C-alpha cells in the first residue's frame, strides 16, 4: 500500500494551527514535553508505543531524564503526511500540555 501523500507547505501550516504544542516543517513535526519524573517519562513512552503500534506509525523518541523529544515523519513519503498529524493528535491526548 503506498504511503499517504506528503502535505503541501500550506496544508502543513494550516494543520499546525490545530497542533499548538508541535512545531514543524516539511521534514517533520517536533514536540518537547517535560514530565514530573523520569518514571512518568518512561510511562509516557510506553503509552505512545501502544498507540504507535496500533497505528503502525512509529515516532522517534529521545528521552533525557524527564524530558521527551518527539519527532514524527513519514519516511516513505519523504515528509509529513496525515499519518503524522493523526499520531500527533493521539500523543497530545496522552501527554500534558
What are these regions (language model features)?
Residues 1-68, 72-97:
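Long, contiguous binding/interaction regions
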